[in-house]
Structures are given as C-alpha cells and as structure tokens.
C-alpha cells in the first residue's frame, strides 16, 4: 500500500502536534454541509426513508448493530466485501453442525446430503445468472482464480505470437496480471483501452482496436473505482464478429443488478461470493459449455479425473474437470443461501434502490469543497454503481480513512483498490472509496458526510 502521510493514533479531544495544541471540533462552521446533513438525517429518520429497503433488511445483518471506536458502525466498504445476512451464516453453521462430510465420494447419509446441497448451490447460481445449464458453473476459490483458470486453460491453449488481448486501463489487477503472464508465455500482445473525457473506458477506441488479430476481450462489467459500466452486449457482438472470445469480470455487477449471461452472450463471466452476501473462499466461473469441454484441466488431483493410470490419466467432464481436490463445501452451500436471500428481495428492487442511494451519495459528496470524485457524473442516462472513489485536496486518503474510522466509526477503503494502472492514468497514487450496498441507508450517507466534513476541518486546522 502507498505511504501514509502521518500515522494517526486514537485521537483524544485535544491533540498536540509539535509545540501547538488543538481542540477537536466535530463540525467546522466553514463547512455548512455539517448542519445541512444533520438536518437531512433527522428528516430521513421520520420520513419515507424509515421504510426504505436499507432499513428493512438491516435486522438481518448482525454485524451492523455495533459500535466501533465508540461510534455506531457505518460500513461503507461493500465493494471490497459485503456483509453477510443471518441466513448465510446459519447455512454455513448448519453444514458444519449437522452434515459435514466430503462430497461426490461417499454413499452414507452425510455425504449424500452434503453432495445434494453442494450441487443444489451450483444450480442456484446458474439460475441466478440465467445460465442454460448448471454444468456451465465452475466453483473456484474466488474470482481471481476463475480468471486464472481461463488464462491458463483457455489462454495457453489458444493464444499464439501476434494474437491480441484487449483490456482497459480500468481493470482490476486480477484481470491484468494473469494475461501479462500468459502473454509472456505465448507471445500474445496486450492492448489497453484508455478513458474518455467522462472518465469511462472509451468504447469507440475499444471497437477500433478489435481486429482479426483479436482473440480475447477481457473487461469489467462495472468498475470498482469509476463506478461506470460497460455495454457488454455490444462489446460481445463486436468481438464475435472477428471470432474473438469475451471474458467479463462481473464482481461489481452480479451482486447489484440482474445479470443474464444468455442475454449478454459473453463466453466467460466471473464473480465472487463474498461481494454478494456470501462467504469468502469461493467464487465461480461461468463458461459456455462447448468452450469448457474444449479446455484442458487447470489443476490436477482428485475428483477432476475419469481414470488414472501410471503413464497417463483421462479427465472428467466439466465442471468436475476444473474442480480438483476437496472443494469449499460449506462455503458453496452458504453461497447458495446468499443467492436465495438476494433472490427473495429481488435483484431489480436492489438495483433500483442502489441507483437512488448511489446518486444521493454522489450529490452529497460532490457538495463538499475540494473533493474530486472519479468517474462519470450520474444523469438520466448514466447510472453509476453505488460507490464513489475520491480524493480531498491536500489530504492523503489513508489519513482520511484512518480518522473516519477512529473518530467516527465510518469504514471506507483507501489505497489503489487493486487498480494501480488506473490510478496512475488518473494522476494519483491512491484514492478513498465509499461503497454502498442495499443494506445501507441515506442515514449512513449523512453520517459519512458529517464525519468527512469533520475530518477535513481537523486536518485543515494544521495548515
């Protein structure tokens, strides 16, 4: 992580720096947003927001009902990982308490029960993204492993010197580094799409880059920094016109909106459980059936074989071919519970609510002086994801995030968000990021804005 401007302790009400002592003030009169946000929060508590989706579901998330550093927890880091509802935690505990056993290996009751629930989770994931067959879902350790699976299994087998892989400068490291490794091994060339004036990947340039040399387009669906989304259906058409495949990093879209893989028509799509109310340690790869059948194994070991001889082995059909060894059984079952939970609320409802609260976050944050938000401005035609990456002039984002946590119990992300090339392109080393999920409320946003104003006021007092 980037260097920190100063290491902040747990601050008392009066702080001494050098030979001067300063008293902390929660809100500076120079930042009128404090009183405005506080008034807004009071109105929200008694108005229609009191029955918002965020308020209705918060009871399901035990972790949100606690104090951190003497303040009520305000969790605004769901783009890094989401919190887990009780139903998911209970599903994980029930597996270990009542039918813990290995899958696909035993005929006894516990093994049969575990196998049934494990495969049921696969079917739930397939239905959730509208895959035509559950065998198109490969369970992986996370989305990073899913991308590496495609890179090593499909990429090493299909790319040759001079072939081109198109990405954008806004990709997560997980969608850059594997293709760097594969390009070094195969001689393939990586082509990067830069941003346009709205700070979104330039789709016109992407289309211009696609040529008969293009073998793969690997792009995000929603950016974890810019909050922008890409027109995947159009990109797929352009790529398929020249015989290229498309891999979609859907980690920031599957948890937040309806994702239909048959409608998108992408060849591969990856997502991660822990960003969609599920546990860590499991993600999934969607791959078109014919492609998965054409790909060699990624890892060797138990379960992925058909027959093993001393001089050779034959391999199982997908998805087993790509799931060597004992899988994350309880985690897969809990992911299935997360899918049930999200489906019970309804992804259209979740997306609609997040568009509203995400716009509210953008408007409140942009009203603060000296704040620079990255990515496009929201409009009738541009719906940002419910996150804002930003910087405050003169403040290091890590100092800012530390103060918010220690003094206000507000949890946000600071750093490069696994997107160093993008930050370099934007001309900064790091940014702060506040990211929302459907369990957040406008009250959370207001608390964050008040806390941020106090943070800026505190640091400005030393200038």
Curated annotation (Swiss-Prot):
Tissues and organs where the protein is expressed, per its UniProt entry: Ubiquitous.
Catalyzed chemical reaction(s): (sulfur carrier)-H + L-cysteine = (sulfur carrier)-SH + L-alanine; L-selenocysteine + AH2 = hydrogenselenide + L-alanine + A + H(+)
Main location: plastid
UniProt biotechnology annotation: NFS2-overexpressing transgenic plants have enhanced ability to tolerate and accumulate Se and may be used in phytoremediation.
UniProt keyword Endoplasmic reticulum present: no
CDD domains per record: SufS_like
Active site: 418 (cysteine persulfide intermediate)
Cofactor(s) essential for the protein: pyridoxal 5'-phosphate
Residues bearing PTM N6-(pyridoxal phosphate)lysine: 275
Xref: SUPFAM superfamilies: PLP-dependent transferases
GO cellular component, one term: chloroplast
GO BP, one annotated term: selenium compound metabolic process
Keyword check for Plastid: yes
Activity regulation comment: The cysteine desulfurase activity is stimulated over 40-fold upon complex formation with SUFE1.
InterPro entries noted in UniProt: Aminotrans_V_dom (IPR000192), Cys_dSase_SufS (IPR010970), PyrdxlP-dep_Trfase (IPR015424), PyrdxlP-dep_Trfase_major (IPR015421), PyrdxlP-dep_Trfase_small (IPR015422)
Pfam hit, one: Aminotran_5
UniProt note: pH dependence: Optimum pH is 7-9.
Molecular functions (GO terms): cysteine desulfurase activity; pyridoxal phosphate binding; selenocysteine lyase activity
EC number annotated for this UniProt entry: 2.8.1.7, 4.4.1.16
Keywords of the record: Chloroplast, Lyase, Plastid, Pyridoxal phosphate, Transferase, Transit peptide
Subunit annotation: Heterotetramer with SUFE1. Interacts with QS. Interacts with SUFE1.
Family classification: Belongs to the class-V pyridoxal-phosphate-dependent aminotransferase family.
Name of the protein: Cysteine desulfurase 1, chloroplastic
Species: Arabidopsis thaliana
